[in-house]
């Protein structure tokens, strides 16, 4: 049975799982007497757990200004919905995933103002301005993002940008695995 819009909330003894299904949240007007949510108790003989990963933010002043988003959210807008999150997007990252976001934006025809990578000596993977060994120190704008301030060895400068995608890397989602006394193991090959 496929259960869309359902989140497993816990793992319990005997192969029992708690799951919350959002039934009518996505509808402007649901069927009469339909519940908003159903909490399911699922008992399974066997389970495949694919918990995925959660993107980490990068903290800096005013990182909660409208127009500042996680890089994975920007890629969802671009790749799933063909929607540009801005006209001049900057990417602040410490890993290769931020560069992937810039390439996806370029493929949709969205302007990439800059990729700001905290790592030294990184090479651009596409046709976009790259500031390696740099960081975002401030965001500017009254009703939303209008520019960002970055700092590198060359000093500080301000770049016009109406969207800032942030990627601080990925953490494996091990919550449910740990409910079952599973322990994460590092594997260099994956």
Describe the predicted segments one by one.
Residues 1-190:
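Residues forming the flavin
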């Amino acid at each position: 049975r496929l259960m869309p819009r359902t989140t497993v909330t816990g793992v319990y003894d005997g192969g029992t799982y708690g799951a919350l299904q959002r039934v009518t949240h996505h509808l402007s007007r649901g069927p009469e007497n339909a519940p908003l949510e159903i909490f399911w108790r699922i008992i399974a003989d066997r389970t495949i757990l694919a918990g995925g990963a959660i993107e980490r933010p990068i903290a800096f002043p005013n990182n909660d200004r409208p127009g500042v988003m996680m890089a994975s959210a920007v890629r969802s807008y671009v790749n799933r919905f063909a929607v540009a999150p801005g006209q001049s997007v900057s990417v602040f990252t410490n890993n290769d995933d931020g560069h992937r976001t810039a390439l996806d934006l370029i493929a949709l025809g969205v302007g990439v103002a800059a990729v700001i990578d905290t790592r030294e000596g990184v090479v651009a993977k596409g046709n976009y301005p790259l500031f390696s060994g740099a960081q975002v120190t401030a965001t500017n704008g009254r009703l939303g993002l209008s520019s960002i301030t970055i700092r590198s060895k060359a000093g500080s400068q301000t770049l016009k940008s109406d969207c800032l995608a942030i990627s601080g890397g990925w953490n494996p989602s091990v919550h449910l695995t740990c409910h079952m006394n599973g322990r994460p193991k590092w594997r260099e090959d994956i």
